[in-house]
Amino acid sequence: MYFRLLIFYIFMFMACTPNDTSNSSAVPLRSEIDDKYKWDLTKVYPSDEAWEEDLKKVKELSPKFADYKGKLLSSSANLLEAIELSEEINQLFGRLFHYSANSLNTDLKNEKYQAMYQRVRNAAIKSGEYSSYYAPEMLEKDYSVVESFMDSEPKLAVYEKSFKDLYLDKPHTLSENEERILTMTGKMSG
């Protein structure tokens, strides 16, 4: 039985091995592909330099989120400012990741884009450390506080579902220190 299986696999291997080993059927290099078939990442960033500027910007903005620690729910204005800052940071990270990941996906051997992807990943981990207090601090107060803030500041009403989801997850939310440690484990995972 073993011998028959071995013969079967040998014949299958031979049948699947191409006869023509020339490069004529090889996957073309990216430089050989017509531009109309390539991602146009210039719509995300016109250049790597523009990407660098936004990475610098997100690294400057991220620590500012920590300024709201301990006073996040002291007023509706503070909560709104913190959320708007968080949104700005998250939008920047979205673009930064999209550009670096898709640039890397065009050539996984490209060390420049490997480094860019790793740099934005590290910046996101660091940003997560600055914001690790957010959920635990929000959940220290009753949801009625957030509801009153939404009543007094109409711009907060668009975040109602996010607030409700956060409070629904309260039983599964870690302390600030545990959240920070969990965020920091991203440094070890890749």
Residue ranges and their predicted role:
Residues 1-9:
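Sec-dependent signal peptide recognition
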Residues 16-190:
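A well-structured
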Residues 9-17:
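Hydrophobic h-region of N-terminal signal peptides that target proteins for export
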